[in-house]
Amino acid sequence: ASDFFGKHNIQNCLAAILLTYAAGAPLDVIRQVLKAFKGVEHRLEKVRTIHGVTYYNDSKGTNVDASMKALEAFPQGHLILIAGGYDKKTPLDDFMALAAKRVDTLILIGDAAERFEAAAKKAGIQDIRRTGYSMEGAIMLARKIAKAPQAVLLSPACSSFDMYDNFEQRGRVFKGIVNAI
């Protein structure tokens, strides 16, 4: 599956291979399923590439640990990260330290923006922007500043409840805006 990446996803995939093989599934069937598998919606989901900039929906990144896994899937960096939402008040030091290594621009949305900005500055992130409660504003800002080979990643590290009913709705809104560009 060419759009399937990230160390945590590979670990899950290997576990599934071992379990299905141990249960008696033939290797050719396992291989066919793996080739067809495109990942799971809202989990490091590749949405679209526009002028060499690829947009990823990781709306399921509803906590710091999940969003750190998403950042770790981009060891080369070159990211514009859209983060924020309903603030769970979790510690941000490790998340922002990793973001400082991988993220060129941090775009913050929602209730958590102020606290996330303070933590990002403390971690040494230079380019921090805020777009209030506007996903469209965040995406349009990312589109304006992104240059190939950068990627735009929505991985909020927050719940969605300040702006959306759930992470699925947030992810669908993100994809809808990106696909309308």
Which sequence ranges carry the predicted segments?
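Nucleotide phosphate-binding/pyrophosphate-handling subdomain across enzymes
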Residues: 2-104
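Short, well-ordered alpha-helices that flank and scaffold nucleotide-derived cofactor binding pockets
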Residues: 21, 69-72, 97, 118, ...
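C-terminal helical cap/extension that packs against the catalytic core
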Residues: 93-150
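Short glycine-rich, flexible loops that bind phosphorylated cofactors or substrates
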Residues: 115, 160-162
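Phosphate-binding loop of NTP-binding sites
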Residues: 140, 144, 162, 173-181
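Short beta-strands and strand-loop turn motifs
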Residues: 153-157
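Short, solvent-exposed loop/turn segments at secondary-structure boundaries
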Residues: 164-167
